[in-house]
Amino acid sequence: MKSGRFIGVMSGTSLDGVDVVLATIDEHRVAQLASLSWPIPVSLKQAVLDICQGQQLTLSQFGQLDTQLGRLFADAVNALLKEQNLQARDIVAIGCHGQTVWHEPTGVAPHTLQIGDNNQIAARTGITVVGDFRRRDIALGGQGAPLVPAFHHALLAHPTERRMVLNIGGIANLSLLIPGQPVGGYDTGPGNMLMDAWIWRQAGKPYDKDAEWARAGKVILPLLQNMLSDPYFSQPAPKSTGREYFNYGWLERHLRHFPGVDPRDVQATLAELTAVTISEQVLLSGGCERLMVCGGGSRNPLLMARLAALLPGTEVTTTDAVGISGDDMEALAFAWLAWRTLAGLPGNLPSVTGASQETVLGAIFPANP
């Protein structure tokens, strides 16, 4: 069974940077050693946003973007290696999620698409890459997402305490770690995505630091109720979503009914939308004693305060409190999934994704000989 140093690479729906994490992994433990966040050039970020909102592009443009993202991921890995004074031979493999540009797990031809050419990463780092993690699960009738609950269960499950792990990235997803029950998990809806999109358009800021804008505004209750009427929120699990659905166009359609509103009030309402949709799903799933939050949203003081208020009797904390950096959780998960792939172990949970069976995930791109 492969063990040793692995690197995880994650570029999420929030597009706030490439997260790269170094860890030692074996069948008994996952120990994080180092991490860094690598910036995404504005031009690449905008190109990804355009695709996710349905903008057409030529096959040549698409291929170039795939290559450029692969090179970007390789640069991020090489920067971490240099920082840690490591060589390619010191790393067993890289687990790279890729950049999701479309996720449509239902319909006549279910599919999901993550780009960032793994061949570029393997060639430019000299390290074996495991990627394309989601499509085997979809081929077996699953949603292809979320995949991180398996990792949450391996690291954070408790024999007696009802726990849930909440990742608030661009999309928010929940892992249900309930003793005596199969692991559950699904996407609850928007996490930071709509908040980030709104403040970017209104103030040119990548995100609402310390929720300053949202705290200066007031929740517009009719707008909140209008958004909560979206059928995704009442759809039963298994379910997953992404930027192709909850994007700026989605927000604009709801705002048409509310002309002339204060932008800060919209920001406050979007924060409340995230908090309410998460808390409702926690309660519908039977509640928990401890909700451990990770992802960029765990740094949003308003979101954390609202979750605590909406979930009385639940200890709302961050995964940092149990020794796992909330900023690095997803990248760490894909390093772990790469380890499982090389070990020939399944990486999905049918109780989460709805797949017909467990399966080894991903494709392997060997290092240069």
Swiss-Prot record:
- Tell me which CDD domains the record gives: ASKHA_NBD_ANMK
Gene3D superfamilies, alphabetized:
3.30.420.40
- What is the reaction catalyzed? 1,6-anhydro-N-acetyl-beta-muramate + ATP + H2O = N-acetyl-D-muramate 6-phosphate + ADP + H(+)
Q: Which GO terms describe its biological process?
A: 1,6-anhydro-N-acetyl-beta-muramic acid catabolic process; amino sugar metabolic process; peptidoglycan turnover
Q: Which InterPro entries match?
A: Anhydro_N_Ac-Mur_kinase, ATPase_NBD
Give coiled-coil spans as residue ranges.
none
Q: In which pathway does it act?
A: Amino-sugar metabolism; 1,6-anhydro-N-acetylmuramate degradation; Cell wall biogenesis; peptidoglycan recycling
| E.C. number(s) listed in UniProt | 2.7.1.170
| Gene Ontology terms, MF aspect | ATP binding; kinase activity; phosphotransferase activity, alcohol group as acceptor
Per UniProt, ATP binds at: G12, T13, S14, L15, D16, G17, V18, D19
* Cystine pairs: none
For this UniProt record, give its keywords in alphabetical order, as a comma-separated list: ATP-binding, Carbohydrate metabolism, Kinase, Nucleotide-binding, Transferase
Enzyme class label: transferase
Transferase as UniProt keyword: yes
Record flagged with keyword Transcription: no
The task this protein performs is described as:
Catalyzes the specific phosphorylation of 1,6-anhydro-N-acetylmuramic acid (anhMurNAc) with the simultaneous cleavage of the 1,6-anhydro ring, generating MurNAc-6-P. Is required for the utilization of anhMurNAc either imported from the medium or derived from its own cell wall murein, and thus plays a role in cell wall recycling.
Similarity comment: family membership = Belongs to the anhydro-N-acetylmuramic acid kinase family.
The protein, known as: Anhydro-N-acetylmuramic acid kinase
Organism classification, top ranks? Answer: Bacteria, Pseudomonadati, Pseudomonadota, Gammaproteobacteria, Enterobacterales
